[in-house]
């Protein structure tokens, strides 16, 4: 069984869903420490003024928290601003009408926990991209550890024989320990597709909403990479 995982990011990029497409079970790493310098409460979209960050404000607890305990600071009318930015940026996109209702409804709700907002969006995006994969919340496995040891413990709890990692895993995964437990580690080979965009020259590595509104969510990868099971 191929297991992959990632933190539950806000409006994730296309590579997040590419990894999901290749695995059998996808782990949502909701129990790792929140990082404001990452993409857990922010992401990038393309506007007529260039690339812009959309950031969900969070309450500062004064101590490190796991992602699933982070609360949203409902100040500054952030949700309406995010909705207006999406609308102004993409209302001329070919597939705006098809998907915009979901985002309008999402931003009309009041959210308390960041994990609830992010998972609502992730599940909606999975539906639009026609990705049907079981999701497992890391917090539900009741295993402990950090970094490589946590990933290994989670894989063992789920019965993985292949661990699919993003390229960042090369910096921290102890591949030898995985091999000792009978788990093969492979790394995602994701080539960002070039597609028709609005607002000038092509910009890669944006939130997947750019891809969705511009292409309709057509599948960028036609099948699992055979090398994962070789």
Specify the residue positions occupied by each region the protein language model found.
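Residues lining hydrophobic/aromatic ligand-binding pockets adjacent to catalytic sites
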Residues: 1-230
């Amino acid at each position: 069984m191929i297991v992959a995982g990632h933190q539950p990011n806000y409006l994730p990029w296309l590579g997040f869903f590419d990894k999901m497409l290749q695995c059998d079970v996808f782990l949502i790493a909701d129990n790792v420490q929140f990082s404001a310098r990452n993409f857990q409460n922010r992401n990038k979209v393309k506007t007529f003024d260039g690339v812009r960050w959309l950031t969900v404000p969070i309450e500062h607890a004064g101590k490190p928290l796991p992602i699933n305990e982070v609360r949203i600071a409902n100040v500054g009318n952030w949700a309406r601003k995010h909705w207006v930015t999406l609308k102004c940026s993409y209302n001329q996109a070919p597939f705006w009408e098809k998907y915009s209702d979901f985002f309008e409804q999402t931003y009309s709700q009041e959210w308390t926990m960041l994990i609830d907002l992010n998972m609502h969006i992730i599940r909606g995006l999975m539906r639009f991209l026609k990705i049907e994969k079981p999701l497992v919340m890391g917090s539900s496995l009741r295993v402990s550890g950090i970094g490589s040891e946590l990933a290994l413990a989670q894989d063992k709890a789920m019965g993985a024989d292949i661990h699919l990692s993003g390229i960042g895993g090369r910096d921290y995964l102890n591949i030898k320990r995985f091999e000792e437990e009978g788990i093969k580690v492979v790394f995602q080979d994701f080539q960002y597709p070039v597609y028709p965009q609005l607002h000038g020259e092509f910009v890669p590595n944006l939130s997947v909403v750019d891809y969705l509104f511009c292409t309709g969510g057509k599948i960028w990868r036609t099948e699992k990479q055979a090398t994962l099971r070789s």
